[in-house]
A protein has these predicted regions:
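Bacterial N-terminal signal peptides
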Residues: 38-46
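Active-site mouth loops of central-metabolism enzymes
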Residues: 72-79, 213-224
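Positively charged n-region of N-terminal signal peptides that target proteins for export
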Residues: 26, 31-35
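Aromatic- and acidic-residue-enriched carbohydrate-binding clefts of CAZyme catalytic domains
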Residues: 65-69, 105-143, 183-214
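Sec/Tat signal peptide C-region and signal peptidase I cleavage site
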Residues: 50-52
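Active-site-proximal helices and loops of the catalytic beta/alpha 8
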Residues: 54-70, 83-90, 101-125, 144-159, ...
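Hydrophobic alpha-helical signal peptides and transmembrane signal-/tail-anchor segments
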Residues: 5-24
């Protein structure tokens, strides 16, 4: 029977759309169900990964980025002493040496060379001129000879430089420096002879005197040019990098201006980003440079990091707390406590300042310092610095033989120090994971499935049982001959008190 026009209209425009709607609605509902199901599954999977993956901490680098260098701070060693011990330094696995300041400095106590007493270690932190050579460290020729010896062993020389201030005795400042900057008044900031009262006030912090030391007008182009000639000479003589003392006391472009300054451009000039009077630092990317930017309130860490690496002072304090209380959590060990990428941090257990100023770290034993060193050096990032304590020093006699010039004690070549230095280089490219014993007495730093460094912080023997990624089997520590067994993701061994181990 032929379709009536009305029937055709009702079927095509009413019933068919209804059926299509019902089918379409059903399809959309089904798709919606599967869509939300997929979201739930994805969330569950993500949660599972988060539980098992290491938490990304502030300052952490990407998993394939590693630092392999190590620095020996040859504190108060003369250039000749460093040269004579270069083979031992290289054999100990150190890739860099950091010297004390090489510039002409204040001569106090009649030229005495005791670290503290008839002479002072901090006199070489009081410049009178920016030329190479001083009575404590040695001559320019001796510096050149030291650098040549370092090159022979593949060791980079880092020089401690300090453009921020001069000696207290401004009358002793070299005439050549005075003339270069247009007179002594042009050498200092407007309030450069006034001591800082509030270290968190950036104008005071960067233009007044640290501890009362006269604050140099580092924005004066004449000074910048003079200082950069010193840097260039150090490089010509063989230096491969610098540690900038009191770096946070030199202003950044965003800091308030001193009345004598037109712009805060010291760091762009010092890092070769900008020329001064026709001079520009070349090959900046071939130099290792970091600044002493001690952490505190209102310190512009990220802005400083645009120019150089930075010190991880808070992390150093945390490590000293760990070795003092002899307990740690993996979170305490892992957190760099810094806003800057860990690849740009210089780390330490102690520095010359923590040792000398109020002797904050000087009461820690050499063994405790060594245990802390193994922890920071086994890690994937940061560039660790080992402070060479005075030879003959004890926890009752911090200055030991008390002489500027001779080498420090032999801890830098302790077998445990050597083992972890070499482990660090061998683990290049291996991602770290950190574990601790249930009671916190043991810290383990794993690097991929290639090796582990284990530290027993306690003063008792410990039966170790800790997670590992190493393949099943037995591993023998090269220093102590201790046998470790890995089975089903668990590493076991018996650890001696206050001892570190490296297995691979």
């Amino acid at each position: 029977m032929p379709w009536h026009p009305v029937s055709f209209f009702l079927c095509f425009f009413v019933f068919v759309p209804q059926r299509l709607y019902l089918y379409t609605h059903k399809i959309l509902y089904t798709m919606k169900y599967y869509f939300y199901s997929l979201i739930v599954i994805a969330l569950l999977l993500t949660a599972s990964v988060s539980i098992h993956a290491s938490k990304k901490l502030k300052g952490e680098a990407s998993c394939r980025t590693t630092n392999t260098e190590t620095i020996l701070h040859v504190w108060c060693w003369s250039f000749n002493t460093i040269r004579e011990n270069m083979k031992s330094i290289a054999d100990a696995g150190f890739t860099m040496v950091q010297t004390s300041p090489a510039n002409h400095c204040f001569i106090g106590d009649g030229g005495g060379k005791q670290i503290m007493g008839n002479g002072k270690w901090y006199y070489h932190y009081q410049p009178l001129d920016w030329t190479i050579g001083n009575y404590q460290m040695g001559t320019r020729d001796e510096f050149i000879a030291m650098c040549a010896e370092a090159k022979k062993y593949g060791v980079r020389v880092i020089v401690d430089v300090l453009p921020n201030h001069t000696a207290f005795d401004t009358s002793a400042v070299a005439q050549g420096l005075r003339d270069a900057v247009g007179g002594i008044d042009n050498l200092y900031h407007a309030n450069g002879l006034v001591e800082i009262k509030d270290y968190n006030d950036r104008l005071q912090c960067t233009t007044s005197g640290v501890g009362g030391l006269p604050d140099v007008n580092t924005e004066n182009p004449d000074f910048q040019y003079y200082y950069m000639q010193y840097v260039a000479d150090l490089i010509r003589c063989g230096a491969g990098g610098f540690r900038y003392d009191t770096a946070k006391h030199i202003g950044l472009p965003s800091d308030p201006l001193d009345p004598k300054s037109k712009k805060n451009d010291f760091w762009p000039v010092a890092m070769g980003m900008k020329s001064v009077k026709g001079f520009r630092l070349e090959n900046r990317d071939q130099l290792f440079i970091y600044g002493e930017v001690l952490q505190d309130r209102n310190v512009k860490e990220k802005e400083y990091s645009k120019y150089m690496g930075l010190t991880a002072s808070n992390y150093g304090h945390e490590i000293r707390q760990i070795i003092s209380k002899r307990k740690a959590t993996s979170a305490e060990v892992a957190d760099w406590q810094h806003s800057v990428s860990a690849t740009k941090l210089t780390t330490w257990v102690e520095s010359h300042d923590t040792y000398c100023n109020a002797n904050e770290s000087a009461t820690l034993t050499d063994t405790q310092i060594r245990l802390g060193w193994v922890i920071i050096t086994a890690r994937q990032n940061g560039t660790p610095l080992f402070f060479s304590r005075p030879d003959g020093s004890t926890r009752e006699n911090f200055w030991g033989n008390n002489l500027i010039g001779p080498k420090g004690n032999d801890e830098f070549r302790n077998p445990e120090v050597v083992a972890v230095n070499k482990f660090r280089k061998e683990m290049d490219g291996e991602k770290e994971y950190i574990g601790t014993a249930a009671d916190g007495s043991v810290v383990a730093i794993g690097r991929g499935d290639k090796g582990m460094a284990i530290v027993n912080l306690s003063q008792q023997e410990v039966a170790l049982s800790i997670a590992t990624k190493m393949a099943d089997g037995t591993y023998t520590d090269a220093v102590h001959g201790t046998v470790f067994t890995a089975a089903d993701g668990i590493l076991t061994a018996t650890l001696a008190p206050e001892t570190s181990y490296v297995i691979k």
